[in-house]
C-alpha cells in the first residue's frame, strides 16, 4: 500500500490502528516514517513506519498496529 500513496494527501488526516485505536492526526511525513500527534495539552507523538500503512480512505490513514505495539513508537 505505501508505494501507491500520495503522502502529501495524508497531512492533517486521522490515523488509526487495529480496532480503530486513535493514533492522532498526521503531522508530518519523513523518508520512512509517518509522524502523528495525539492529544490537546499533553501531545503524544508517534513515529510510525510507513511499512505499517494498510489503507487510506481519504479521511483515515489505517496502520497494521495494535495499541500495545504503538507504544514502542511513542515519544513525548
Regions found by a protein language model. Give the residues of each.
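Peripheral interaction segments used for macromolecular assembly
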Residues: 1-76
